[in-house]
Amino acid sequence: MRALWIVAVLLVGVEGSLVEFETLMMKIAGRSGISYYSSYGCYCGAGGQGWPQDASDRCCFEHDCCYAKLTGCDPTTDVYTYRQEDGEIVCGEDDPCGTQICECDKAAAICFRNSMDTYDYKYLQFSPENCQGESQPC
């Protein structure tokens, strides 16, 4: 319970869809994006370069690519809505940017869920020095 309280306090300063993304991660993947993916491999967390280290890191790479394709949207501050219907997440259609961001986040959460068996703790807190070289194109 104390851990949940700490996470809640940390999220107070986080704006926009980052909060929604964490909630989607918990609903779809059943684990915290902050705890497991905020600093994982070469692409999970801030920045990203080189080649994804495993399937979980590839989810982050694809998520970054999805965000990069958005025009006129800011995934860090734009908020979105979604609902659950018959166990499926349905992104709200009230805002075009919000819908696109939600779809990116939903795809990433599904990807993380599907790649849990490849998660390797050796890539948690992975040094950026290991991510040198040319980045893979989206």
From Swiss-Prot:
The UniProt record lists the keyword Repressor: no
Keywords tagged on the record: Disulfide bond, G-protein coupled receptor impairing toxin, Neurotoxin, Pharmaceutical, Presynaptic neurotoxin, Pyrrolidone carboxylic acid, Secreted, Signal, Toxin
Tissue: Expressed by the venom gland.
Site (Binds Trp-30 of CA2, important for stability (Asp-99)): 105
Propeptide feature: residues: 79-82, 119-124
Predominant place of localization: secreted
Matches recorded under SMART domains: PA2c
GO terms under cellular component: extracellular region
Record localization: Secreted
PROSITE patterns the record matches: PA2_ASP, PA2_HIS
Site (Binds Gly-31 of CBb): 93
Site (Binds Asn-16 of CBb): 45
Region forming the signal peptide: 1-37
Site (Binds Arg-14 of CBb) residue list: 49
PTM-bearing positions, type Pyrrolidone carboxylic acid: 84, 125
Entry-linked InterPro entries: PLipase_A2, PLipase_A2_Asp_AS, PLipase_A2_dom, PLipase_A2_dom_sf, PLipase_A2_His_AS
Residue(s) at site: Binds Trp-61 of CA2, important for stability (Asp-89): 95
Described purpose of this protein according to its UniProt entry: CAalpha-CAbeta-CAgamma: The acidic subunit of crotoxin (CA) is a heterotrimer of three disulfide-linked chains generated by post-translational maturation of a PLA2-like precursor. CA has no PLA2 activity and is not neurotoxic by itself, but plays several important functions in the crotoxin complex by increasing the lethal potency of the uncomplexed CB subunit. It acts by physically occluding the hydrophobic interfacial binding surface (IBS) of CB. Heterodimer CA-CB: Crotoxin is a potent presynaptic neurotoxin that possesses phospholipase A2 (PLA2) activity and exerts a lethal action by blocking neuromuscular transmission. It consists of a non-covalent association of a basic and weakly toxic PLA2 subunit (CBa2, CBb, CBc, or CBd), with a small acidic, non-enzymatic and non-toxic subunit (CA1, CA2, CA3 or CA4).
Oligomer and partners: Heterodimer of one of the acidic (CA1, CA2, CA3 or CA4) and one of the basic (CBa1, CBa2, CBb, CBc or CBd) subunits; non-covalently linked. The acidic subunit is non-toxic, without enzymatic activity and comprises 3 peptides that are cross-linked by 5 disulfide bridges. The basic subunit is toxic, has phospholipase A2 activity and is composed of a single chain.
PANTHER family (alphabetical): PHOSPHOLIPASE A2 FAMILY MEMBER, PHOSPHOLIPASE A2, MEMBRANE ASSOCIATED
Miscellaneous comment as given in the Swiss-Prot or TrEMBL entry: The crotoxin heterodimer is inhibited by the crotoxin inhibitor from Crotalus serum (CICS). CICS neutralizes the lethal potency of crotoxin and inhibits its PLA2 activity. CICS only binds tightly to the CB subunit and induces the dissociation of the heterodimer. Tested on the CA2-CBd heterodimer.
Protein name as it appears in the record: Phospholipase A2 homolog crotoxin acid subunit CA
Species this protein is from: Crotalus durissus terrificus (South American rattlesnake)
